[in-house]
Amino acid sequence: KRSHYIIGGLALAMSMPSCLQAQTTQPKDTTMTRTVVVEQEYNPDIMDASKVNVLPKVEEPTVSKKEVEYATTFFPATSVPAGLMRPYTGKEVQPGTTPGYVRAGYGNYGNLDILANYLFRLSQKDKLNVRFQMDGMDGKLTLPFTDSEKWNAFYYRTRANVDYTHQFNKLDLNIAGNFGLSNFNFQPESVNSKQKFTSGDFHAGIHFTDETAPLRFNAETNLLMYERQHNMFNESEANTGIKETIIRTKGDVTGAIGDQQLITIALEMNNLLYNGYTKNVSTGDEYFKNYTTLLLNPYYELDNDDWKLHIGANVDLSFGFDKSFRISPDITAQYIFSDSYIVYAKATGGKQLNDFRRLESICPYGELPEANTTATLGYVQRPYDTYEQINGSIGFKASPYPGLWFNVFGGYQNLKNDLSYLGFDPSNIHSGSYLSFAQDNTENLYLGGEISYDYKDILGISAKYTYRNWDSKTEEYLLAVKPVSEMSFNVRIHPISALNINLGYDYISRKEVKEYAKMTAINDLHIGASYNV
């Protein structure tokens, strides 16, 4: 029995090295050995097998509502951020307007008023405006300084206009044509019984519209024609009409110096041509000569928050008629302080062409001045051009209260060859009376003021007064038609959007010339109302 225990112990001792060797040295990877190894590991990772992860249930978070607190304390900004976003501004669109307008009126003394205007919007860049106007009177007037003698007077003016504009990207092209006709008669016992003025003109020009461009320009050309039918102090003579043709060319070039300064050179040339009853056929003396004027106006402008300056000069040249060279200032200075108070001063001048159009605007009943010598009795001549040597003034504007403005000013004006007119009674030379244009050098000092008040576009009130003290060196009687006191008063009431009411009064008194005449003052009271439907 003891031998059995010995044999068993030897067998156990012989088997122990092989077991230890199996644990330290793994055999070739096989399915059997992999299974054995796995069974000997704790919490093994099984390769080539799918795992299923089970997550615990998660509860959804809840948010507790709290009262929002805003910062209401003001802090002064010491600097503006460089990348500040600009505010959005919507595109302004003008409300649509009615393209056409028609007005017709008739009153006592045969007063006629007709006006028609229509704007054709051919496209977004093309516009055509057509206008027709006729006004006048035909009635019996009582002549002054007579025993109720009547004058069967008539005066009709007709105007027709066509204006076309095409808008390019930075330029506007404008082409226009105008026609005018004036028919009227003179008072009884005048040297002429009637008169007719016929006018027409053609215009073509381009206008640079980009105000931000460093260099911009404008240019235009005009052909103006005008005829006075009767120009002799005896209308029974045939072919006394005089035709005036003006070829006018204008242009300017502007160069910007930054955002606040610019320099401009403006040029205007007028070529005046005359034909018809312009010379004495028997002697060959010519009283209407063709001539050319050249007007040059260079100036500098400054425009900022406080100052507005315009500094330039008017250089006027004439070739073939009148004085060959003249120069006058073109200066304006304006200083703004406290946003609503303005102190200003200006000195301007320049040539005023006394062409046939200006003669009609001053006095349509005036005859052209007679030629100087008695040998040319019955012939007329062209007046010299008026030249404003200086018109200087200083003034002060202020708005102490919203909507309220007032302006006080004073100045001095000097005119060379100032155009006026005077009356002549029948004489041994002319059997009838007439008005004739005449000229002299004049000057005047003036003072004035104006005030206006506007309340919320409901009520507007304005008043203006100007006093002038005239002086003439040689022909004082020409001052009889000059205004001494000018006053105007206007009230505008706009109670509702469609209703407008206007009330106004104008007063003009003339200078009294001793031992000659004093014209009656002009008093004009007018009232009107309009309602838009």
What residues fall within each predicted segment?
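Exposed, low-structure sequence patches enriched in small/polar residues
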Residues: 97, 102, 308, 316-320, ...
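N-terminal periplasmic/intermembrane-space "pro-region" immediately following the signal or transit peptide
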Residues: 20-92
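Flexible loop and strand-edge segments within Gram-negative outer membrane beta-barrel domains
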Residues: 137-141, 149-159, 173-216, 222-246
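Outer-membrane beta-barrel translocator/receptor signature
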Residues: 81-84, 93-102, 106-145, 152-160, ...
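Surface-exposed extracellular loop regions of Gram-negative outer-membrane beta-barrel proteins
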Residues: 122-142, 264-272, 277, 287-318, ...
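Transmembrane beta-strands of outer-membrane beta-barrel pores
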Residues: 106-108, 134-138, 168-170, 179-185, ...
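Residues on the lipid-exposed face of transmembrane beta-strands in outer-membrane beta-barrel proteins
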Residues: 116-120, 160-166, 202-210, 249-255, ...
